[in-house]
């Protein structure tokens, strides 16, 4: 039997797939919960429950998985619009602001989310927080030759930034764009995500950061109630 966290992720992934309609162009997110969603989508396509779906993936991992499941794919540049994007998050605050980028895919994830007519976030209950960045570091993608300079500028903004090192290779993590990632902890967490997103992205050498501000339309949360996995739809706090 799957552990409780996996059960929550499976429940919320299944709920997200129920929002998909025939003929949609879909943004297919990254991470463990999004992977379960892609698997559920593949099963519905294989059974004929869904038809004429086109996927736009946000990572190499998602592209490989979707292709293996027979989900038709296109590049972001080949579609005029995305009807629905479904993705996970590392943290979600009460105003539906997010931190993403634990898998270093946040640049493509943000491109897809911002293109979508509707962006639905799927998480388990451990990802819901009152304030961002108290429990999860903020990823900032930087040009390889600029990481030291950006590290210093982030310190001026009150952040401690460490270069993300790879687990299965010597040296740092390298993104799909060929860049490096700084993981940032802001003193006291992030009180104004919109302001900080702009400040960081204005630093020379920064490509993008993992704050997703004013993009999310709905948050589906997997939770356990009386030992049974279910789904709760969050209400946004304005």
Swiss-Prot record:
Substrate binds at residues 30-33, 87-90, 100-103, 127. Pfam families: Rib_5-P_isom_A. Pathway: Carbohydrate degradation; pentose phosphate pathway; D-ribose 5-phosphate from D-ribulose 5-phosphate (non-oxidative stage): step 1/1. GO terms for cellular component: cytosol. Its EC number is 5.3.1.6. Keywords: Isomerase. One of its GO terms (biological process) is D-ribose metabolic process. It catalyses: aldehydo-D-ribose 5-phosphate = D-ribulose 5-phosphate. It is an enzyme of class 5 (isomerase). CDD domains: RPI_A. SUPFAM superfamilies: D-ribose-5-phosphate isomerase (RpiA), lid domain, NagB/RpiA/CoA transferase-like. The active site is at 109 (proton acceptor). One of its GO terms (molecular function) is ribose-5-phosphate isomerase activity. Catalyzes the reversible conversion of ribose-5-phosphate to ribulose 5-phosphate. Homodimer. Belongs to the ribose 5-phosphate isomerase family. This is Ribose-5-phosphate isomerase A. It comes from Prochlorococcus marinus (strain MIT 9313).
């Amino acid at each position: 039997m799957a552990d409780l966290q996996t059960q929550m992720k499976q429940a919320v992934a299944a709920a997200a797939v129920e929002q998909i309609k025939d003929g949609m162009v879909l943004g297919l997110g990254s991470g463990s919960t999004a992977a379960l969603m892609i698997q559920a989508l593949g099963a519905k396509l294989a059974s004929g429950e869904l038809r004429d779906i086109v996927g736009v993936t946000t990572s190499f991992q998602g592209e490989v998985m979707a292709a293996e499941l027979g989900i038709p794919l296109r590049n972001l540049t080949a579609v005029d619009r995305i009807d629905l994007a479904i993705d996970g998050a590392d943290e979600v605050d009460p105003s539906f602001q997010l931190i993403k980028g634990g898998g270093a895919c946040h640049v493509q994830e943000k491109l897809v989310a911002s293109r979508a007519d509707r962006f639905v976030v799927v998480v388990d209950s451990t990802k819901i927080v009152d304030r961002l960045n108290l429990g999860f570091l903020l990823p900032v993608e930087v040009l390889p030759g600029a990481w030291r300079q950006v590290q210093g500028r982030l310190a001026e903004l009150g952040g401690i930034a460490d270069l993300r090192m790879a687990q299965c290779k010597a040296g740092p993590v390298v993104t799909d764009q060929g860049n490096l990632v700084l993981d940032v902890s802001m003193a006291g967490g992030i009180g104004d995500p919109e302001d900080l997103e702009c400040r960081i992205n204005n630093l020379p050498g920064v490509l993008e950061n993992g704050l997703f501000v004013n993009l999310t339309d709905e948050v589906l949360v997997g939770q356990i109630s009386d030992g049974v996995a279910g789904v709760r739809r969050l209400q946004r706090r304005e």
